[in-house]
């Protein structure tokens, strides 16, 4: 049984009750959205995961990527990133490790959080294939599905799998060349496999078998966008849309089998094209939850891509995206450090909150009202408690204090609020 099959059967699970309470939503309404495939609750049956709802009519959720690379392997560092994710309100974590003992790293990450955990299994497949055969492109079907099954048994809650990379998608790419080609790592692995062996993508060819594996453990399938644009010039091209058409067809198959599914999206997109991208996805994929990376709205800000992504993420979420993958200041430059994780997470949560306010979500507006109440009362401690990051504003206030404990050092004696209050007392 999965959350989706239960919902279709009219069964109300404990996870549904929890999510409905968190969202301020009637559980029957939520159950109907899950049954239709408009909402997912990524929760592997083998793991005690905190239930998190992702999809239409819910708050916008934020994911944190972390993990090792061949150039930097430090489990302790990754666990600090997990700790930061827990502390600053991430809704999910993805382990994208490609260096070191991948199963051991994943085990430690899972042990140190109750947030939903996602992976990209093709990364481990590529690492294993290189160790076993000497080249990533020599991976085979058995290796691919063995890794997926092993991760499902370990408790991974959702998996990014690039099932839409097909011979037809690769043909669209070749017929309409890009500035930057394929920038998705998993997408590149499978594109290279197809081109070198002239074989179909096993994840597409054996999609029904894949669904059997995922359904057994109620792993949510996150259909990866292997043809996402890697620069603004490549946005919304034929390869991207061809893959999206295929993903829409695969969404139908998932729903028929009762497998929870969401769809991933771009990427690098000019601000004026973001809304159109969201509408196209929601139409082609029939309102499946949409999970976007950014989108980044300019390529000129390495070192500041948490900002470019937050700008794009706000509009994306207002226009239909349900799940934002954070982007850190280190994007396009190096592996993220702990401080990068915090900066990226807070920036993405700002985008999510701004979008939820624009969409009129009651939970988002409740928080805004509480902040306004705290400010009018000059209740600084309450303001810090409500803030997305309590530590930074508290520290900043201590650095340059005001003589008046109700005011801040910007205005001091000339505080507008205090001045009007004083007049009101007369």
Curated annotation (Swiss-Prot):
UniProt keywords, alphabetically: 4Fe-4S, Iron, Iron-sulfur, Lyase, Metal-binding, S-adenosyl-L-methionine, Thiamine biosynthesis, Zinc
EC number(s) given by UniProt: 4.1.99.17
Principal EC category: lyase
Single GO MF descriptor: carbon-carbon lyase activity
Cofactor note: Binds 1 [4Fe-4S] cluster per subunit. The cluster is coordinated with 3 cysteines and an exchangeable S-adenosyl-L-methionine.
Annotated positions binding Zn(2+): 268, 332
UniProt key word 4Fe-4S: yes
InterPro entries in alphabetical order: ThiC, ThiC/Bza_core_dom, ThiC/BzaA/B
GO biological process terms, semicolon-separated: thiamine biosynthetic process; thiamine diphosphate biosynthetic process
Binding site for [4Fe-4S] cluster: 408, 411, 415
Positions that bind substrate: 65, 94, 123, 162, 184-186, 225-228, 264, 291
Catalysed reaction equations from the record: 5-amino-1-(5-phospho-beta-D-ribosyl)imidazole + S-adenosyl-L-methionine = 4-amino-2-methyl-5-(phosphooxymethyl)pyrimidine + CO + 5'-deoxyadenosine + formate + L-methionine + 3 H(+)
A Pfam family per the record: ThiC_Rad_SAM
Pathway: Cofactor biosynthesis; thiamine diphosphate biosynthesis
Keyword DNA-binding belongs to the record: no
Cofactor: [4Fe-4S] cluster
Database matches in HAMAP family: ThiC
Protein role: Catalyzes the synthesis of the hydroxymethylpyrimidine phosphate (HMP-P) moiety of thiamine from aminoimidazole ribotide (AIR) in a radical S-adenosyl-L-methionine (SAM)-dependent reaction.
Sequence similarity: Belongs to the ThiC family.
Protein name, as recorded: Phosphomethylpyrimidine synthase
This protein's encoding gene: thiC
């Amino acid at each position: 049984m999965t959350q989706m099959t239960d919902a279709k059967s009219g069964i109300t699970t404990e996870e549904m009750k929890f999510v409905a309470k968190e969202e301020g939503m009637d559980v029957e309404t939520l159950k109907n959205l899950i049954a239709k495939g408009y909402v997912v609750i990524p929760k592997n049956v083998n793991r005690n995961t905190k239930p998190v709802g992702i999809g239409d009519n819910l708050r916008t959720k934020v994911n944190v990527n972390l993990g090792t690379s061949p150039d930097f392997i430090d489990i302790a560092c990754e666990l600090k990133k997990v700790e930061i994710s827990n502390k600053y309100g991430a809704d999910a974590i993805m382990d994208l490790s490609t260096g070191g003992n991948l199963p051991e790293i994943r085990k430690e990450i899972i042990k140190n959080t109750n947030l939903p955990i996602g992976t990209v299994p093709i990364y481990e497949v590529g690492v294993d294939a290189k160790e076993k055969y000497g080249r990533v492109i020599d991976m085979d079907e058995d290796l691919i599905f063995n890794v997926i099954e092993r991760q499902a048994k370990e408790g991974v809650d959702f998996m990014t799998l690039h099932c839409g990379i097909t011979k037809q998608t690769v043909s669209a790419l070749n017929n309409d060349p890009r500035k930057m080609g394929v920038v998705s790592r998993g997408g590149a692995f499978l594109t290279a496999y197809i081109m070198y062996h002239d074989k179909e993508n096993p994840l597409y060819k054996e999609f029904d078998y894949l669904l059997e594996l995922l359904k057994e453990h109620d792993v949510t399938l996150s259909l990866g966008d292997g043809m996402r644009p890697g620069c603004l010039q490549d946005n919304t091209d034929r390869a991207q849309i061809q893959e999206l058409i295929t993903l829409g067809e695969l969404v139908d198959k998932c729903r028929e089998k009762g497998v929870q599914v969401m769809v991933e999206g771009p990427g690098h997109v000019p601000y004026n094209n973001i809304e159109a991208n969201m509408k196209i996805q929601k139409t082609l994929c029939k309102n499946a939850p949409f999970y976007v990376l950014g989108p980044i709205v300019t390529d000129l800000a390495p070192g500041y891509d948490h900002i470019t992504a937050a700008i794009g993420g706000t509009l994306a979420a207002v226009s239909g995206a349900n799940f934002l993958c954070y982007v850190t200041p280190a994007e396009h430059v190096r592996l993220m450090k702990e401080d990068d994780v915090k900066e990226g997470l807070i920036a993405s949560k700002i985008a999510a909150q701004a979008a939820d306010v624009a969409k009129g979500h009651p939970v988002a507006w409740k928080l805004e009202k509480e902040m306004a109440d705290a400010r009018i009362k000059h209740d600084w401690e309450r303001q810090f408690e409500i803030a997305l990051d309590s530590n930074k504003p508290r520290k900043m206030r201590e650095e340059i204090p005001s003589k008046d404990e109700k005011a801040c050092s910007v205005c001091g004696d000339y505080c507008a609020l205090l001045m009007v209050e004083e007049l009101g007392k007369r």
